[in-house]
């Protein structure tokens, strides 16, 4: 059954539901599970239509992403996208959800999307601390490559294999302004095991909440860029203030409740 949308609704929930159901041609396509005999005096198409529409409107308001997923061939939850600790790279399963979401937004031009990143103070902070130490190690090798005249364009392109890591770890340890490095009677640095050097560098690597929020923002921006790549206009996508852990706020309509998965991006439809 097809119904042409007429702009007579005035209540916001109805308008949001219509935006969710109306396709790019201005048509709302509703499937009616009709069975029975027209000769049956108890048979009522009107009642059936009313019930289906009421159910759709309710679902459009209370579970909009579930409705989109069912309409566009995605069985996954579309309202959250999880990330690996410390990473802003979109995983393969999240990319599939974004592709489904891109199809849905392309066919529902009245919809807009809020995108809010989250970072986990526990797991993300630990990974970022280790990444900070790894960067310091690569920096030391980069200095050597610069001196030799064959440095890459960026330290991100420098690789340190397991055989040479202790060498550059030692250089990073000696270059760092660590407060309590073991020294001998002459005040010179003592040789310490690599594990101890790394532990001191990790302890000195300070990852504050601002760094975590920057990571959350990078996640949100990565999701926005991926959705834009599907063909959705950037003007329909809005970045929301980042949040840490499961703290409330951010994307309106997101519960902030995803135990064990606070490293994510929350999505909400407007």
Predicted regions and their residues:
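Extended terminal
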Residues: 1-261, 267-270
